[in-house]
Amino acid sequence: MLSPRRINGLYKAEPKIDYELISVLRERTGVPIVMHGGSGLSAKEYRECIVRGVQKINYYTYADKAALEGAKQFLAEHPETYVFAPVSVVVGRAVEANLDELVQALYEGQLNR
């Protein structure tokens, strides 16, 4: 696995990707590049990483954040909730919506052809 200047979690400053490093490593090694973390990247930045050789993106923080926001909103609207089951449904939908958004961004213009 290669992580070209990436760290996990939310960032205080804008993340910077070394695109040239991704290209060089992919070209010289011939092995697939894994991006460990993609928090804060735009759709354009994700696509540029893919074009340069990233073949796997480990994605968690923003999906986890969407889950938490979904749970908080549900509990605010339903304060009488006393078990987790209904919260888990909302959490699952929030994560699914977040991942759908990511997939649409990554494959913009390529899906539904």
Task: Please place each PLM-identified region on the residue numbering.
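Electropositive phosphate-/nucleotide-binding environments in soluble metabolic enzymes
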Residues: P15-Y19, A43, T61, K65, ...
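Alpha-helix-loop-beta-strand connector modules within alpha/beta enzyme cores
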Residues: E14-M35
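Glycine-rich phosphate-binding active-site loops on the catalytic face of alpha/beta enzymes
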Residues: P4-N8, R52-G70
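Extended, intrinsically disordered, low-complexity segments
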Residues: Q73-R113
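Structural preference for beta-strand elements that scaffold enzyme active sites
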Residues: M1, P32-V34, K56
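Catalytic cores of alpha/beta
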Residues: G38-V54
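Glycine/Thr-rich beta-alpha phosphate-binding loop at enzyme active sites
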Residues: M1-E20
